[in-house]
Amino acid sequence: MISLMEARNLRKERTGVVLSNKMEKTITVAAKFKEKHPIYGKFVSKTKKYHAHDEKNECNIGDTVRIMETRPLSKTKRWRLVEIIERAK
């Protein structure tokens, strides 16, 4: 059986770039990933946007961040900021 702490660490994580920080305590993060085309087999680059909770309003546009899945915080927010990997220059 998985303990409570292990279950918390099994949540999904994404790494991406901050696109917007105009909302109060919320950032928009663009996460890139590659997906195989079902017919042709070529890997296609795709981007998905996530709204993430930034408790201290510490992110700026262009920062590379890590976000983690969490309970629903609003209609569109289901992710929270874990760490800022690299600051924008």
UniProtKB/Swiss-Prot annotation:
GO terms for molecular function: rRNA binding; structural constituent of ribosome. Signal peptide: none annotated. InterPro entries: NA-bd_OB-fold, Ribosomal_uS17, Ribosomal_uS17_bact/chlr, Ribosomal_uS17_CS. GO terms for biological process: translation. Keywords: Ribonucleoprotein, Ribosomal protein, RNA-binding, rRNA-binding. It comes from the Bacteria. One of its GO terms (cellular component) is cytosolic small ribosomal subunit. The keyword Transcription does not apply. Belongs to the universal ribosomal protein uS17 family. HAMAP family: Ribosomal_uS17_B. One of the primary rRNA binding proteins, it binds specifically to the 5'-end of 16S ribosomal RNA. Part of the 30S ribosomal subunit. This is Small ribosomal subunit protein uS17A. It comes from Bacteroides thetaiotaomicron (strain ATCC 29148 / DSM 2079 / JCM 5827 / CCUG 10774 / NCTC 10582 / VPI-5482 / E50). The lineage of its organism: Bacteria, Pseudomonadati, Bacteroidota, Bacteroidia, Bacteroidales. The gene is rpsQ1.
